[in-house]
Design a protein with these regions (language model features):
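Long, positively charged amphipathic alpha-helical accessory segments at protein N-termini or as interdomain linkers
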Residues: 2-23, 33-178
Length: 178
């Protein structure tokens, strides 16, 4: 869990420093740039000869511009109007990632930073759980990987990945109609 959180913090920090865009972490593993998903992170744990290894996959949309069928998606370019040379971008990111991974923060600090960076934290949002929509407020993520949400009809509850969906794109669509 802490490697997931720390990786998300590293990616968020890199993109925020590079672009000056609003960069938030959408629990558990996406980066939101100016309201659009610009990055996804996947971490897989493997055991080989009694040693645990982690494979970290980070997909950053850098220059893509066509998201006509993906209303929640964006890229560094569409979120910031900044264009980067992909090789230079990749080299900068790689150096930043390695330096931060080698100097890992204490777990309590990671959890605090992660929670400060959560997308839609302490804001009324629309969630879908078991095909039912209701309002709720993201309170925090915990050390076990759960997201705590205060739901309008059910009170404070914890959720694991894929047990609930934040429908953040509906908010933008509603805002655009007003």
């Amino acid at each position: 869990t802490f490697l997931n959180y720390y990786t998300a913090i590293i990616v968020r920090d890199f993109l925020a420093n590079l672009t000056n865009a609003s960069c938030k972490i959408k629990w558990p593993n996406d980066i939101i740039l100016n309201g659009k998903k610009g990055c996804g992170i996947l971490i897989e744990k493997k055991k080989f000869e009694n040693v645990e290894y982690y494979i970290i996959g980070i997909g950053i949309n850098v220059l893509q511009t066509d998201f006509s069928n993906l209303p929640k998606a964006g890229s560094v370019l569409t979120a910031t109007d900044l264009s980067f040379d992909l090789k230079e971008f990749t080299n900068q990111f790689h150096q930043y990632l390695i330096s931060r991974i080698q100097d890992i923060n204490p777990e309590e600090e990671i959890l605090n930073i992660y929670n400060q960076s959560l997308f839609r934290k302490d804001e009324i949002s629309v969630f879908q759980k078991n095909n039912l929509r209701q309002n709720g407020i993201i309170k925090n993520a915990d050390k076990n990987g759960f997201l705590w949400i205060d739901l309008e009809n059910e009170g404070l509850q914890k959720f694991f990945h894929k047990e609930i969906e934040l429908l953040y794109w509906t908010l933008k669509l509603i805002d655009e109609r007003i």
